[in-house]
Design a protein with these regions (language model features):
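Active-site-flanking segments in enzyme catalytic domains
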Residues: 1-160
Length: 160
């Protein structure tokens, strides 16, 4: 929307390199885009409903917005692409297996990661996607059910 810090764009691009190529190919093929923005995402998309919003995925527009901060670039880029993965595969977070894992492991996940953004299944899916790609050993240790779910799901839909 205005001027953004090039270092944040660099961080976003570095984070995107951690995502399997097959996922990013689908992302691009389906016409999705990622933007670093200096707009207040919380105000622009959520009317100030939340205390802090680092990123958002707008399904209808096929756009992901990342706030113009190093924290947002580091912590929300892969998370937001996780929403794309969830959405692109028919909202995996709404399937029975994930619902069961949500009920059994969400509290453990929130405590282990101090995950303030996890308020529903879709947020948990995106968070688990992020952690699976960046720190799978901790994810497996803390929430093995979510770890194996994500491993099996991603290997079913994508090549690694």
């Amino acid at each position: 929307d205005g001027t953004v810090d090039n270092s944040n764009i660099h961080i976003v691009n570095s984070e995107l390199k951690k995502i399997p190529e097959s996922i990013m190919e689908q992302f691009q093929k389906n016409g999705w885009h990622i933007y670093v923005t200096d707009a207040d995402i919380n105000q622009k998309f959520y009317q100030g409903k939340y205390s802090t919003v680092l990123g958002t995925t707008q399904y209808a527009d096929k756009k992901i917005y990342i706030a113009n901060t190093s924290q947002a670039a580091t912590e929300s880029t892969i998370h937001e692409v996780g929403h794309f993965v969830d959405y692109s595969n028919g909202f995996l977070s709404d399937q029975e297996k994930f619902k069961e894992l949500y009920l059994s492991e969400v509290r453990i996940y929130i405590k282990a990661y101090d995950a303030v953004c996890v308020r529903d299944r879709k947020e948990l899916f995106a968070e688990v996607f992020w952690q699976y790609l960046t720190n799978p050993s901790k994810l497996q240790l803390e929430t093995p059910g979510l770890y194996f779910y994500m491993k099996n799901t991603l290997h079913t839909f994508y090549s690694f």
